[in-house]
UniProtKB/Swiss-Prot annotation:
PTM: Consumes NAD(+) and auto-ADP-ribosylates on the tryptic fragment Ala-47-Arg-66 in vitro. Also auto-ADP-ribosylates using NADP(+).
Effect listed in the UniProt record for changing residue 52 to A: No longer toxic
Subunit structure: Homodimer, forms heterotetrameric ParS(2)-ParT(2) complexes.
Pfam families: RES
The keyword Ribosomal protein appears for this protein: no
SMART domains the UniProt entry points to: RES (SM00953)
Name of protein: Prs ADP-ribosylating toxin
Keyword annotations from UniProtKB, A to Z: ADP-ribosylation, Glycosyltransferase, NAD, Nucleotidyltransferase, Toxin-antitoxin system, Transferase
Organism: Sphingobium sp. (strain YBL2)
Function according to Swiss-Prot or TrEMBL: Toxic component of a type II toxin-antitoxin (TA) system. Expression in E.coli inhibits cell growth; bacteriostasis is neutralized by expression of cognate antitoxin ParS. ADP-ribosylates E.coli ribose-phosphate pyrophosphokinase (RPPK, prs) using NAD(+) in vitro; ADP-ribosylates RPPK on 'Lys-182' and 'Ser-202'. Cannot use NADP(+). Also auto-ADP-ribosylates in vitro; in the presence of RPPK auto-ADP-ribosylation decreases.
Gene Ontology MF terms: glycosyltransferase activity; nucleotidyltransferase activity
C-alpha cells in the first residue's frame, strides 16, 4: 500500500515537474535545505501544496506552466519517517524568511542519511504536515511521482499591487 503526498511543480529546462531528484531545491535552497543539498518538498494535501506555493508568488502574474504532482510513498517507508513537530524543533524553525535554524536542521538530516523521509510542520499552518524526501537515501527508490494535471491558480489568490 501507499500514501499520497502532493506538490505543485513546473517543468524546467533540466528537470520535469514529477522529478524526484531534488534538483530544484539543490539549485535554489529552501526552508529546510541549503544550496547544494537535494531535497524534494511535498505536502500532505492538495490544498496545502497550493498554499505552500502561492505564498511565493507575487503580483507579477500567475505562473502557467505548473502541474499537480502526486507522490506515492510506500507505507513501510512512511512508517520509518523521522517526525519533527513544533514542540521538538529548535526555536526559530519557523522564522520568516527561513533562517539558519531550519536550513541547518533539514540539511543535517539529509546529509546524515538517517531516513528517506522527514515529516515537518507547515510554517503557514503548523498543525499541517509537509514531507521532505531525501532522494539520496536507498528507500527513496520506491517512491513514485506522476503528473496528475495542469495546475491553474485561481486569480483571486493574487492581489495586484
Amino acid at each position: 500500500m501507499t500514501t499520497s503526498f502532493w506538490r505543485i511543480a513546473t517543468d524546467a529546462r533540466t528537470y520535469e515537474a514529477d522529478d524526484l531528484s531534488g534538483a530544484g531545491a539543490k539549485i535554489t535552497g529552501g526552508r529546510w535545505n541549503e544550496v547544494g543539498v537535494a531535497i524534494v518538498y511535498a505536502a500532505s494535501s492538495r490544498a496545502l501544496a497550493c498554499l505552500e506555493t502561492v505564498v511565493h508568488l507575487n503580483s507579477g502574474g500567475l505562473p502557467l506552466n505548473r502541474y499537480l504532482v502526486e507522490i506515492e510513498v510506500p507505507d513501510e517507508v512512511l512508517a520509518s519517517a523521522e517526525v519533527a513537530t513544533p514542540g521538538n524543533l529548535p526555536v526559530g524553525w519557523d522564522a520568516e524568511p527561513a533562517g539558519r535554524v531550519s536550513i541547518s536542521f533539514g540539511s543535517q538530516w539529509a546529509q546524515s542519511q538517517r531516513t528517506a523521509l522527514l515529516l515537518v510542520p507547515s510554517v503557514i499552518v503548523p498543525e499541517e504536515t509537509n514531507l521532505l524526501i531525501n532522494p539520496a537515501h536507498p528507500d527513496a527508490k520506491g517512491i513514485k511521482a506522476r503528473k496528475v494535471r495542469k495546475w491553474l491558480y485561481d486569480p483571486r489568490m493574487i492581489r495586484k499591487a
